C-alpha cells in the first residue's frame, strides 16, 4: 500500500504544480490513466469480470470528458499530457 501511495504522490508532483494539487485536470487524467492501465491488465486474466468492465468504461468516459475540457481550455497542456501519457487524440 505504501508503494501505491508513493506512486500516486509522484504522479501528482509530475503533472500538478505541487503535491497538494490533486484536483487539477492534468493530475486527474494521469491518475485515471494509471487505473485504466491496471484494469486492462486485470481483464486479460479475468475475462468474465463484467462489473469491473463497467467501472472501466466509466473511467474511460470520465477521462475523455476531462481531456475534452483540457483541450478546449489549455491546448498546450493537453498536447503535453497526451504525448507524455501515450494517448491518442
Curated annotation (Swiss-Prot):
Q: Which Gene3D superfamilies match?
A: 6.10.250.3130, S15/NS1, RNA-binding
Q: Name one GO biological process term.
A: translation
- Which first-to-last residue range defines the signal peptide? none
**Keyword Manganese in record:** no
Q: Name one Pfam family in it.
A: Ribosomal_S15
Family the entry assigns: Belongs to the universal ribosomal protein uS15 family.
What is the protein's name according to its record?
A: Small ribosomal subunit protein uS15
This protein's species is Buchnera aphidicola subsp. Cinara cedri (strain Cc)
Amino acid at each position: 500500500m505504501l508503494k501505491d501511495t508513493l506512486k500516486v504522490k509522484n504522479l501528482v508532483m509530475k503533472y500538478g504544480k505541487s503535491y497538494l494539487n490533486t484536483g487539477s485536470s492534468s493530475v486527474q487524467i494521469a491518475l485515471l490513466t494509471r487505473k485504466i492501465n491496471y484494469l486492462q491488465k486485470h481483464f486479460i486474466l479475468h475475462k468474465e469480470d463484467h462489473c469491473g468492465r463497467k467501472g472501466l468504461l466509466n473511467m474511460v468516459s470520465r477521462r475523455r470528458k476531462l481531456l475534452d475540457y483540457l483541450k478546449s481550455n489549455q491546448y498546450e497542456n493537453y498536447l503535453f499530457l497526451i504525448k507524455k501519457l501515450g494517448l491518442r487524440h
